[in-house]
Regions:
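Short loop/turn segments at secondary-structure transitions that flank enzyme active sites
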Residues: 15, 116, 172, 197-199
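Glycine/proline-enriched, intrinsically flexible loops and inter-domain linkers
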Residues: 76-174, 181, 192
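Phosphate-backbone binding interfaces of nucleic-acid-interacting proteins
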Residues: 1-82
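Solvent-exposed alpha-helices and their adjacent loops that cap or buttress functional pockets
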Residues: 2, 39-43, 58-61, 99-103, ...
Length: 202
């Protein structure tokens, strides 16, 4: 088009800062002034690749690893929750059909959220852990999951119907995951689904 190019948009994999290569690396709005060197925006850091041998779910997150190190004499600083939650009635129902598979299920809800890119420091942390940042709502659940080894997911209240149902997968049930892949579920898989009337949908 007769316009000289002084740069190129690249994926995290092409830049060597993450494993995701299916799209461009995007920065939050107003996070960096134009022309900022990548070395300043994304400083080099050490990433540890650890194998956790005990079959202890609470030991598989960052906090669990820190507690193990604390047992060896290292200092431990427990993260504090910045948000104080109130115990309020949920605006939807919860059904757990399989209490053996899901003996404890916690729900919370928030209103007035604005979906936007995550802060750069959180994107960097997720990339370092081999995860692809998506947006601030999804990313914070993944970040806390990595920190506390507690599976989490964010749901859009507009699309869950009458409530949330925790059940086993039906024979031959298929589910399209966030990466766009359609997967066939096993009858032993736990499914978190919304429902309307007699119909439930993952």
């Amino acid at each position: 088009q007769g316009v000289r190019s002084f740069g190129m948009a690249l994926s995290p994999r092409e830049l060597g800062v993450g494993e995701y290569g299916g799209g461009l690396l995007e920065f939050p709005e107003d996070a960096l002034p134009p022309g900022t060197p990548l070395a300043e925006a994304w400083p080099e850091e050490v990433v540890l690749d650890l194998e956790v041998t005990p079959n202890r779910p609470d030991a598989l997150g960052l906090l669990g690893l820190a507690r193990d190190l604390h047992a060896l004499g290292y200092a431990l600083v427990e993260p504090e929750a910045a948000l104080k939650a109130e115990a309020l009635p949920l605006p939807f129902a919860l059904k757990v059909e399989d209490p053996e598979g899901a003996p404890h299920f916690t729900l919370g809800y928030a209103f007035g959220l604005r979906v936007a890119p995550s802060p750069l420091w959180m994107q960097r942390a997720l990339f370092a852990a081999g995860m692809r940042p998506i947006n601030n709502v999804v990313d914070v659940t993944n970040y806390v999951m990595l920190e506390r080894a507690q599976p989490m997911h964010a749901f859009d209240l507009r699309f869950i119907g009458e409530g949330i149902l925790v059940r086993r997968a039906r024979p031959g049930e298929r589910l399209r995951t966030l990466d766009g892949v359609e997967r066939t579920l096993h009858p032993e898989d736990l499914v978190i689904a919304g429902w309307r009337g007699e119909e439930s949908f993952p």
